[in-house]
Amino acid sequence: MNQPIGNIYIVVAPSGAGKTSLVAALLQAEPSVELSISYSTRQARKGEIDGQHYHFIDRAAFEEMKDRGDFLEWAEVYGNCYGTSAPWIRGRLEAGRDILLEIDWQGAEQVRKVFPDAIGIFIAPPSIEELERRLRGRDTDTEEVILRRLASARAEIDKIAEYDYIVVNDDFERARLDLISIVRAQRLRSAPQCRRLADMFRRMGTAGAK
């Protein structure tokens, strides 16, 4: 079986760093990249749509999927479980699709054990002070939750060297372009390009067809 052409992009960021908005902007600019929809046991928030934001399931169904080995990765965060469908990911990669996973650092470590070539991208805030300002500006969390998120952010930033790319979200437009550039550059790497363009090189009668 030929190595799948598709790439896996893992995007990780502390809460409040702007990951969700940046990922949405990337998907709009690069519609060929498919977002993996995670399964979650938490309650849907206002405006969230089942199957679009998450696949919302109860704890028993989640445990059943986990026991079957259906999750490429899973984690429990603040009492709620989140998981990524392994069959869906493998099917899309084998079809040559690029997949984006918007997950936490625990999930990223699990995915890279299975797919060591997965591309890790960390979205960093310009400072902890700015991150705190953004978290407080959302006006959705208690003081306890904000402090817990800030502590988690420091722990995540400690692992920043494990990622392939670091995007600092101090200016949204610049960060958006940085994220798009990563995806476009990865597609132009020699190995995947040789597979995609094998027929073209073969017609040229060149070694690029190998």
Swiss-Prot record:
Task: Supply the PANTHER family for this chain.
Answer: GUANYLATE KINASE, GUANYLATE KINASE-RELATED
Sequence similarity: Belongs to the guanylate kinase family.
Give the GO molecular function terms: ATP binding; guanylate kinase activity
Q: Which reaction does it catalyse?
A: GMP + ATP = GDP + ADP
The UniProt record lists the Guanylate kinase-like domain at 6-184
Top EC class, one word: transferase
- Protein source organism: Chromobacterium violaceum (strain ATCC 12472 / DSM 30191 / JCM 1249 / CCUG 213 / NBRC 12614 / NCIMB 9131 / NCTC 9757 / MK)
Q: Which Gene3D superfamilies match?
A: Guanylate Kinase phosphate binding domain (3.30.63.10), P-loop containing nucleotide triphosphate hydrolases (3.40.50.300)
**Amino-acid positions noted as binding ATP in the UniProt annotation, renumbered to this chain:** 13-20
Query: Keywords assigned by UniProt?
Result: ATP-binding, Cytoplasm, Kinase, Nucleotide-binding, Transferase
PROSITE patterns per the record?
A: GUANYLATE_KINASE_1, GUANYLATE_KINASE_2
- The record's EC number reads 2.7.4.8
Mainly resides where?
cytoplasm
| Highest rank taxon of the organism | Bacteria
Q: What cellular-component terms does GO give this entry?
A: cytosol
Tell me the CDD domains matching this sequence.
GMPK
Q: What does this protein do?
A: Essential for recycling GMP and indirectly, cGMP.
Name of the protein described by the UniProt record: Guanylate kinase
Q: Which gene encodes it?
A: gmk
Write out the annotated subcellular location.
Cytoplasm
Q: Which cysteines are joined by disulfide bonds?
A: none
